[in-house]
Amino acid sequence: MAAPWWRAALCECRRWRGFSTSAVLGRRTPPLGPMPNSDIDLSNLERLEKYRSFDRYRRRAEQEAQAPHWWRTYREYFGEKTDPKEKIDIGLPPPKVSRTQQLLERKQAIQELRANVEEERAARLRTASVPLDAVRAEWERTCGPYHKQRLAEYYGLYRDLFHGATFVPRVPLHVAYAVGEDDLMPVYCGNEVTPTEAAQAPEVTYEAEEGSLWTLLLTSLDGHLLEPDAEYLHWLLTNIPGNRVAEGQVTCPYLPPFPARGSGIHRLAFLLFKQDQPIDFSEDARPSPCYQLAQRTFRTFDFYKKHQETMTPAGLSFFQCRWDDSVTYIFHQLLDMREPVFEFVRPPPYHPKQKRFPHRQPLRYLDRYRDSHEPTYGIY
């Protein structure tokens, strides 16, 4: 029996299949532009130009990667969607740095390292030591503020503190809690600090010009017991002269973190603001001591909105905290209240509608739909 005419035509099309025929057969449109390597003559590969060195190949590959294409790459297709709304930058302006001066300093440092015979010998023998303090200082001076900004974005600090506005923490803020007599618990960007370690006010240091004024606050983003969008103010120092934190005005005394039991991990953030002039914070002052949680209810967005004309966020440091035994003491002795305890209640398990004849199902299948908790298995 002869094959139908449409099958013969389909076989003939498949024999000469190209982009246009594939588009017709698969109900797709042809590509919007030239495909990769479409300009290469595959019939005569010997006549293609050879790179003959890796540097020429790398330069050519970089040019091809940076050239505009009509298609999207894998990362562009599956990458994170960018926010169409531009975020407002409320921080300090970036410092003016001469690119020529940077290149000269870098070239001079390379020349000094090459001329240092001892360093070369130590590197060759693998006995060289790297000064970590100098590395950290260089990191904080160059790319560290942008890394901190990315971490704060990841933990949702800008979203919850400033309603989406962002800033680059230009001023390195160093916070450390004293643990015992000799040990310190530093605060970086998201490390975990227990309430026991944060029982006393920390030591805060930063670099500041003489004659400048600063404001330092510590707030808990996830600890409010009544209002989900409110915070608890743990510490507020205002009109700090220079970097002498101890001489600042104690607008709100320090209160240790008290994450409730069963409420998970809480975020606590230190914010450093640079003031343009002395500010009257009498409306934001709390009594000392202040152990009423209603008086410590706080919103960073409203606080900054009130004083945004005279101060600018400049530094940021934050940590995570969860419940331990010292929180019970804070609730009972300091706050003079019963300690709240939370428990995660899981939703009931979902079971599909019971089948009258559960074919190939075990006997335990009936336990899902019984009113009693007595198991079916083991009784026969």
From Swiss-Prot:
Cite a GO CC annotation. cytosol
Protein name in the entry: Large ribosomal subunit protein mL38
Q: In the record, what lineage is assigned to the organism producing the protein?
A: Eukaryota, Metazoa, Chordata, Craniata, Vertebrata
Query: What is the source species?
Result: Homo sapiens
Q: Which residues form a coiled coil?
A: 99-127
Please name the InterPro entries in this protein's record: PEBP, PEBP-like_sf, PEBP_euk
What keywords are annotated for this sequence in UniProt?
A: Coiled coil, Mitochondrion, Ribonucleoprotein, Ribosomal protein, Transit peptide
Query: Where is it chiefly localized?
Result: mitochondrion
Organelle targeting peptide span: 1-26
Q: One Pfam family for this entry, by name?
A: PBP
